[in-house]
Amino acid sequence: QMHGYFAPAIDYDGGKYGIGLLTKQLPLRLQTLPLPGREEARTLILAEFADYIYCCTHMSLTEEDRMKSLELVKAFTSSSTKPLFLAGDMNAEPESGFIKELQKDFQILSNPKQHTFPAPDPKETIDYIATLKQNAKGFAVISAKVINEPMASDHRPILVELRTAEKADKIFRMKPYLQNPVGNGITVMWETTVP
């Protein structure tokens, strides 16, 4: 079962326009944060889970608004002690001042060398997945890629696969034991919950 959430930013064409989030896990907490945008209002949705926090946003087209948004996001997330991920359309190229400022506190996990926009023939990288450096522990990036899907949106989807660390007591099913001691050596055996 999937859980869907929507944080509207503006009224649009008889409905609402904003940020959506679809999760497998049920969040412990959901919160939205309005962000500046002179061309249109912007927003961020924060979903807190047992082991991490995930934020999704769509930043302004103007650098000044993005910089103000980044300050709000940093203040909004500064008290987090869990790994925190920030994803979305940042409307900024990798060499922009905004991305350089973002990288002071966040580590980009997605591949900024792969273009994401426009979807039919991407020429720009403006979509990212990043993690707050102060809490970037307990996981490793397995892969990061842009998915070849030109029709679902005006941006290509990005995917970052992570492997989370498991505590030893969750990996080992039993205490290690000695088996078949022979000659000058022994074999230590144990059962685990991982392949």
Model-derived features with residue positions:
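Structured beta-strand-rich core segments of catalytic domains in phosphoester-bond hydrolases
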Residues: 1-50, 138, 143-148
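Acidic/histidine-rich helix-loop elements
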Residues: 11, 60-62
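Short hydrophobic/aromatic beta-strand or adjacent loop that forms the aromatic wall/cage
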Residues: 16-19, 42-46, 123-129, 153-159, ...
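Metal-dependent phosphoester-hydrolase catalytic domains
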Residues: 32-33, 63-67, 75-85, 91-169
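Conserved catalytic cores of phosphodiester-cleaving nucleases, focusing on short active-site segments
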Residues: 54
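Non-catalytic, glycine-rich low-complexity segments
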Residues: 167-195
